[in-house]
Amino acid sequence: MKNGMLALGMTAADVPDNFLWGAASAAYQVEGATNKDGKGRSVWDYYLDEKHLAGPGISGALRLTFTDRDQYLKDIQLFKELGLNSYRFSHRLDTYYPDGQGPVNLRAVAHYRQFITDLEAAGIKPLVTLYHWDMPESLSAAGGWENRESVEWFQRYAEVIFANFSDQVDQFVLINEPTVEVATKIMAEKRLKGEELTLPPIVPAGSYLETSLKSYNHILLASAAAAESFKVKGYKGRLGIALPFFPVLTTENASDEDKADARLVDGILNRWFLDAMYKGNYPADVLKLAADRHLNIDVQPGDAERIHDAGLGFLGINYYAPFFIRHQKNASEVYSPEIIFPKNEKLAFNGAVRPDQFSALLERVRDEYGNPPVIITENGAGFEGEDQLTNGKVNDVNRCLYLVDHIHAMRESIARGANVQGYYVWSSHDNLEWLSGYKSRFGMIYVDYDTQKRTPKLSAEIYGKIIRGENISDVDCKSD
């Protein structure tokens, strides 16, 4: 099923009972209201509103006015009409702790409790993310995730969320996309210095490797600490973490150096997290790489065991595309990977469109990591020039094909025993895509940023039909 082969006979009936069909968003990307209700400043307010790293006039204050109840009630009605039975959204650390450390801002509690009440009134179950990149500016200045004290910062914040929302919410995503957050922040800091990277250093190498591995360890420890607090207090429900996984591939004529680099990239981006969570250790090859380079990654005795023993209740998987890796030509370092984009691959904004690698990922988790409960916390795509509003419609054919083929791939993996319990499209709406600003659209719902008018796209229509149990295939993704 490579590159959009026909998905035959696929219906929502091919998934387990009580399956979660949803869409996802993140607070910073949709809410707007930069200075509303006592909110503090995150590092992203600094990057975009003050330093304009996404371009002139691109401000986080625009967004989708999702803090406006009149507006979000209309959005909830759209979700209901599509047939969603769940919606994933995030809280903001900088809203609850405006200065990163001080008293809790209780106005945030009231807002989100009302939002959850409104979701549930529409029959939509909340999946709540605690942290989606909104590090308070003060904590970022103190080192952010590179600082081991971030474990305690996050644990204290998580305890506030659990205390105020565990009666409304029974599933929490603790942290979203550690590897992508770290890479995007590195890129932002480079841009502040007038330097430009063609791509975020999502495949960490060179000087970025120490920062990345140290941050990854602290993020996993922070998740473990939050889970420990959850258990001590006896809250009911499940905790997970949303991790971006990248199947790592090489080309047919790959050299031994290409394959060696690909193996290490897999270790850094995939096995680093899965091995710690489900085996209680970090990958030996990655630890050796760090030791050989004399890197201070702050992995202390007992760290990986603590992460394993936390026993998170589900694994959140964010899947977009695989990475094709080769060894850089004329590189002086033994480990010198680079991402390539083979010409024969159909490409979305995030890389090659490969639903077969989605299946491979789900079945790898099944076979190598004990088949834990899995929720697909993000899956989606954006395509250059596709999201055009014409005569009141957006015929996003490529996104529609992407979703149909990836849902079909998921269904086939479920039939082969993968323990997948939910699926969330990224994203519900077009939104602010970090350093890309508003030019990269990923939503199933088109947003006119000037008027805030919403228009469901073709992909939303077809996704709704899948949820309702209609028999859908690629041929349904056709424009009028």
From Swiss-Prot:
Alphabetically ordered keywords of this record: Carbohydrate metabolism, Cellulose degradation, Glycosidase, Hydrolase, Polysaccharide degradation
InterPro entries per the UniProt record, alphabetical: Glyco_hydro_1, Glyco_hydro_1_AS, Glyco_hydro_1_N_CS, Glycoside_hydrolase_SF
Catalytic activity: Hydrolysis of terminal, non-reducing beta-D-glucosyl residues with release of beta-D-glucose
EC number: 3.2.1.21
PROSITE patterns in the cross-refs: GLYCOSYL_HYDROL_F1_1, GLYCOSYL_HYDROL_F1_2
Keyword Hydrolase applies: yes
GO cellular component terms, A-Z: cytosol
Taxonomy, superkingdom: Bacteria
Entry keyword annotation includes Hydrolase: yes
Family membership: Belongs to the glycosyl hydrolase 1 family.
Name of this chain's protein: Beta-glucosidase A
Organism: Enterobacter agglomerans (Erwinia herbicola)
Upper taxonomic lineage: Bacteria, Pseudomonadati, Pseudomonadota, Gammaproteobacteria, Enterobacterales
Gene behind the chain: bglA
